[in-house]
Curated annotation (Swiss-Prot):
Heme 1 (or BL or b562) is low-potential and absorbs at about 562 nm, and heme 2 (or BH or b566) is high-potential and absorbs at about 566 nm. It is a multi-pass membrane protein. This is Cytochrome b. GO terms for molecular function: metal ion binding; ubiquinol-cytochrome-c reductase activity. It is found in: Mitochondrion inner membrane. GO terms for cellular component: mitochondrial inner membrane; respiratory chain complex III. It comes from Hypsugo savii (Savi's pipistrelle).
Length: 367
């Protein structure tokens, strides 16, 4: 009799994806982030589900419901801060995962890569809408500023913004729909992740050398399950340190003030993981130009496979490309720093130069 693991129609799929999956024998810890992202997603859906049970999506009570959750609900503060800092861990893993793909040429699996870019957009949209829900000052003004950018679209812009707002300003209707979408999107993301994995398992994993490893494969379990568990423990250690010792380190203190449409905070800025894109947006003095640059800064990932001209897939044996890659990383860190600074003399020009360099490296210098 065959093992049920290999004969049962449903368990067979799980077996071929996570247990008997042939994997290259030489993939490094940079390949752990896919599984960590899956764990982050599961964690976010779980904590989010329990948070949604206590949350009210109404402008009058949203802020108080979050406050009530932290004070009155059993371990509500753990749920809330796990969810908020879990989003930060999600983006850390996401950016490292993308960086790994860029460094080792994993983008040559075009379907997997494009699916990943769609996933990135979906996760960013979800995170943005989630940030609006506590209805603090930054939530309200962040939503106002970012949704207002759509008004830069010629001809339909103004109507589009009012359509998204459900009125003439960010108000009750906006909050309600953002909550609905924030609840729905993670499940759509889960489905897209399945497609992402489906495309990946068509080709098999890439490896650090960038050469085919078909002649040297090992089963995923136990080798990589153990390796992933180590990564999981390390991630949970960092997350729990954040949640239990300094849960507000990555947040904005302005968000502890209830939203007030009559009072603008001195510095409106998004969460840290959007600062690089925000800096690119601000570095262009024209509204439409800024919005285009913002969208292109992420959409540019789509064209990377077509810019690949090297005979080697991975950067492992290309020192010059490595220098450029780390220059790109440094540039993104600079942009992240600039995004959090006020719009004043030295920061404006640094942001503009960093934005130009970002696009230059990817389009002109890299290939």
């Amino acid at each position: 009799m065959t093992n049920i693991r290999k004969s049962h129609p449903l368990i067979k799929i799980i077996n071929n994806s996570f247990i008997d999956l042939p994997a290259p024998s030489n993939i490094s810890s940079w390949w752990n982030f896919g599984s960590l992202l899956g764990i982050c997603l599961a964690l976010q859906i779980l904590t989010g589900l329990f948070l949604a049970m206590h949350y009210t999506s109404d402008t009058a009570t949203a802020f108080n419901s979050v406050s009530h959750m932290c004070r009155e609900v059993n371990y509500g503060w753990v749920l809330r801060y796990m969810h908020a800092n879990g989003a930060s861990m999600f983006f850390i893993c996401l950016y490292l995962h993308i960086g790994r793909g860029l460094y080792y040429g994993s983008y040559m699996f075009k379907e997997t890569w494009n699916m990943g870019v769609i996933l990135l957009f979906a996760v960013m949209a979800t995170a943005f809408m989630g940030y609006v829900l506590p209805w603090g000052q930054m939530s309200f003004w962040g939503a106002t500023v970012i949704t207002n950018l759509l008004s830069a679209i010629p001809y339909i812009g103004a109507n589009l913004v009012e359509w998204i707002w459900g009125g003439f300003s960010v108000d009750k209707a906006t909050l309600t729909r953002f909550f609905a979408f924030h609840f729905l999107l993670p499940f759509i993301i889960s489905a897209l992740v399945m497609v992402h994995l489906l495309f990946l398992h068509e080709t098999g994993s890439n490896n650090p050398t960038g050469i085919p490893s078909n002649m040297d494969m090992i089963p995923f379990h136990p080798y990589y399950t153990i390796k992933d568990i180590l990564g999981f423990f390390m991630m949970m250690l960092i997350l729990l340190c954040l949640v239990l010792f300094s849960p507000d380190m990555l947040g904005d203190p302005d968000n502890y003030m209830p939203a007030n449409p009559l009072n603008t905070p001195p510095h409106i800025k998004p969460e840290w993981y959007f600062l690089f894109a925000y800096a690119i947006l601000r570095s262009i003095p024209n509204k439409l130009g800024g919005v285009l640059a913002l969208v292109l800064s992420i959409l540019i990932l789509i064209i990377i496979p077509f810019l690949h001209t090297s005979k080697q897939r991975s950067m492992t044996f290309r020192p010059f490309s490595q220098c450029l890659f780390w220059l790109l990383v440094a540039d993104l860190l600079t942009l992240t720093w600039i995004g959090g600074q006020p719009v004043e003399h030295p920061y404006i020009i640094i942001g503009q130069l960093a934005s130009i360099l970002y696009f230059m490296i990817i389009i002109v210098i890299m290939p």
